[in-house]
A protein has these predicted regions:
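Catalytic-loop of the protein kinase fold
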Residues: 180-193, 198
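Structural motif at the C-terminus of the N-lobe alphaC helix and the adjacent alphaC-beta4 loop
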Residues: 105-118
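Juxta-kinase regulatory segment immediately upstream of eukaryotic protein kinase catalytic domains
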Residues: 2-57
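Protein kinase-like catalytic core scaffold
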Residues: 88, 119, 136, 187, ...
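Conserved structural core of kinase catalytic domains
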Residues: 118-168
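ATP-binding glycine-rich loop module of kinase domains
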Residues: 42-107
């Protein structure tokens, strides 16, 4: 996101009606920031300008995101007077279509009413970059940490402390179970542990929804859900320290992730697909037990 570092100040544009963003995004010029809503801080947007100050330190706990997500302090000014500073995460997308799809996904996730709801970052606006790519602005929330960054902290050790390993496995299970159990379920489609996260209070948090897809559970598509489980288990199993030793034991992955998911199969899937999922999970469990 180094494209934004040269911007000393940007006068934002308002997008009032966000129900159909495609046409409005197409009209943006390179360098435009479009914020969702017509008013910020009681001041019309045309009287504001925004200065972006890079904050790479915000990437702490999100090591794998720093190459694609930029972190900034966005300070709003009116007539040269600073009004407020907000931490932003700004993520570029290859196409406007991908950006708009992800905005819809984030909004849908955050709108769900559920006793175990897992939230994600709230989209606040769009930036048209100089290369014509589109970037999405979201709130940045300190204290959210990706599971792989926790592993990085201990790569110099022989094995990940058991309580940390359990936290990773439980976070992955809780997140996956939640999205697979919804009335209109989501598959993650990139269920590596770098895409699982937790808050400072160790509650699951969703950090990357770009590959999420709402999918029904008919027999033709059931493998997409099973693939999520396998991707996550193999990702946990494939974490090694600097000496080449496995950091999460197969026994722990099976007990705190695979077995937990297996016990919920009858609740997640219909009678006609339970056997398919069960057989796949049994095969996965055998693979992980062998050290795959």
């Amino acid at each position: 996101m180094r494209q934004l570092e040269g911007y000393l100040s940007i006068t934002p544009i308002a997008i009032d009606d966000t129900r159909d963003l495609r046409e409005q995004v197409d009209q943006l010029s390179p360098g435009d920031i479009a914020l969702f809503g017509t008013d910020r801080l009681g001041v019309p947007l045309e009287y504001l300008y925004i200065a972006l100050n890079p904050r790479d330190d915000y990437a702490e706990g999100r090591r794998n995101s720093i190459n694609e997500v930029g972190f900034y302090d966005a300070t709003s000014y009116c007539s040269g007077v600073p009004l407020t500073t907000q931490p932003w995460a700004i993520k570029p997308y290859l196409t406007p279509r991908a950006a708009l799809k992800d905005i819809d996904t984030m909004r849908d996730i955050n709108s769900l009413e559920h006793p175990q709801a897992i939230r994600t970052f709230e989209p606040r606006g769009i930036i048209r970059l100089e290369n014509r790519e589109v970037a999405v602005i979201t709130d940045f929330i300190q204290g959210v940490r990706s599971c792989d960054s926790l592993i990085d902290e201990y790569r110099g050790e022989t094995i990940l402390p058991e309580e940390k390993a359990r936290l990773i496995a439980r976070t992955a299970f809780a997140t996956m179970h939640y999205f697979h159990s919804l009335e209109k379920p989501y598959t993650m489609n990139d269920a590596q542990i770098k895409n699982f996260a937790f808050t400072i209070s160790t509650e699951p948090w969703c950090i990357d929804t770009e590959t999420f897809k709402q999918t029904n559970k008919d027999s033709a598509k059931i493998t997409r859900f099973v693939r999520d489980v396998g991707s996550c288990a193999y990702s946990m199993s494939g974490q090694y320290n600097y000496d080449g030793q496995r950091m999460l034991s197969p026994e722990l992955i099976i007990e705190y992730f695979i077995n937990q998911y297996e016990e919920s199969i009858s609740d997640l899937y219909s009678y006609g697909t339970v056997d398919i999922v069960q057989a796949s999970i049994e095969g996965l469990k055998q693979d992980i037990a062998r050290g795959a």
